[in-house]
Amino acid sequence: MKFTQIPSDTFSHLQLNAGLMLRDFDPKTATLKGTDIMGATSGGVEFKAKPSYTDFGEDIDNCPANMKELKRLDSIEVTMSGTLVTATAEVVRQLVGAADVDPKDLTHVVPRNDLTEADFMDVWWVGDYSDKNGDKNGGFLAIHMENALSTGGFSLKSDNKKKGQMDFELTAHYSMDAPDRVPYEVYVKAGTDEKAGA
């Protein structure tokens, strides 16, 4: 059938597998450091960048809804959510949001009633992309969230003969230092063939 088809290069443009949450990532080198992995997830990760608009023409006579010249972008809510199944004291601190790790006891996470600059963090999600996924030249799709804060709170659900699960939601935040900068960016890089000896 004429219109029951898919692009011939579909496999070259698929995002594959669950990906990783990272504390840091350089898209220029695409080097993965094990110490940057935040933890193991279950069920993948969901990222959303949801814009909020105002239609200034909605109360104007004879103006149809969604007139593009009268539409204005108010803000963009940027979130990442999922479920972690591994925990360290530092990860729990980040999930609590406003909290510290006790410097005298690095196993002790102490919640606070106020926010500090240290509660906001940059977070990367990076997943395999394209049909070329070798160790050196593999493609990737990467999302960088800036000034992310845990807004979903800290939760732990345990179950008999199962792994404990910690649901999370992170929200990226604008900054007064750069109020026009939307607090996320996306990189889409196709992989290339692995060369012998490269």
Where are each of the predicted segments found?
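Generic "edge-of-domain/loop-turn" microfeature
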Residues: 52-54, 89, 132-134, 150, ...
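Short helix-loop boundary/capping segments
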Residues: 90-145
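Ordered hydrophobic segments in well-structured contexts
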Residues: 4, 12-24, 122-128, 137-144, ...
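Short, surface-exposed, polar/charged, turn-prone segments marking secondary-structure boundaries
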Residues: 75-77, 108-113, 171-176
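Beta-strand secondary-structure signal
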Residues: 79-83, 122-126, 167-171
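Mixed-charge, glycine-accented linear interaction segment located at domain edges/termini
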Residues: 140-198
